[in-house]
């Protein structure tokens, strides 16, 4: 019976993903033993000659994207593994900046299914092994791995990184990673390796990160100590032990993440020209990260879902020229710090359009309204989006935020209507 249910290499990607979601008894099962065994069988523990691994509460995706952009501009063949995806599963694996066809993913899943035998794998472990297998097939120069959760026990940590990066430390996933910044810092520093650079972009670094670096013999490089940056209205400068780079173009991604990516790149020893650095920084962009998708009304997508990200988003919103009102379409997961996240956004949002998110982790619209005092509730993200767009005047701003899921739902609605001709 099990063989009948198991998809084949030619099965649709949707069939595989449904199979993977129900394969393991737990959605999250931190630990490296099972996934390491299967990786060894597949021969994917060294997916490329050079590997960056990027952990952090916020900023992982844009740090990875900046590294990818610069390295591609320098002529390297690059693969990136990131999560979660916004609209399509195939977003999780990029080779030379492009998604791979669904058939490549299903072929890799079939390889893993064959190799795993009776070893049980979570959805994320399966996806990580799949990415590593796809990278190995692509014969890349550099692979960039974005940690899923934490670091020490995350499936990506089966690979020994040549450069490890921790972008930021804030309270999120406390059920899994510990109740405070010190505990979370220790987990994230678990990706450090002996005699290898360990780049930290968090300006208020928990002491546990230094402890782990010392225990492992990693080469710690901290923002504000071994490297730093400064910003003006029209450009920025970066400095480290190698010297100073001046008049850099302002990035489209958050400034601290672009600087952290540059610190990691300069510590890597990989040969990259100053022109490639400039071109890569100027062109790095990632969907759903303060993404302005239209004007009149201005529409902004941002996946901010914890207080640290909401603080950054609030700053970006305040920097925009304000003519009309700000209407926020928001849905969140109930295991996030809803009160702390909304406390930041309240200062820049005039009207709230609250929606529930599906699934056991989704917060209800009413749970969001408890923290807001005023606002409208809707039965779905699509309804909240439609209402906000109907109410918005040309001079207003519609902000879609609160979760990857919220932004993804709105993107899907827009895509469906576009393709349906509505």
Curated annotation (Swiss-Prot):
InterPro entries linked: Folylpolyglutamate_synth, Folylpolyglutamate_synth_CS, Mur-like_cat_sf, Mur_ligase_C, Mur_ligase_C_dom_sf, Mur_ligase_cen
Molecular-function GO term, any one: ATP binding
Organism of origin: Escherichia coli (strain K12)
CC cofactor: Mg(2+)
UniProt: 7,8-dihydropteroate binding residues: 29-31, 122-125, 153-155
Name this protein carries in UniProt: Dihydrofolate synthase/folylpolyglutamate synthase
Record-listed E.C. numbers: 6.3.2.12, 6.3.2.17
Binding site for ATP: 59-62, 257, 289, 302
Residue sites binding Mg(2+) 2 per the record: 173
Single GO BP term: 10-formyltetrahydrofolate biosynthetic process
Subunit structure: Monomer.
GO cellular component: cytoplasm
Signal peptide segment: none
Superkingdom: Bacteria
Binding site for Mg(2+) 1: 83, 146
Pfam families given in the database record: Mur_ligase_C (PF02875), Mur_ligase_M (PF08245)
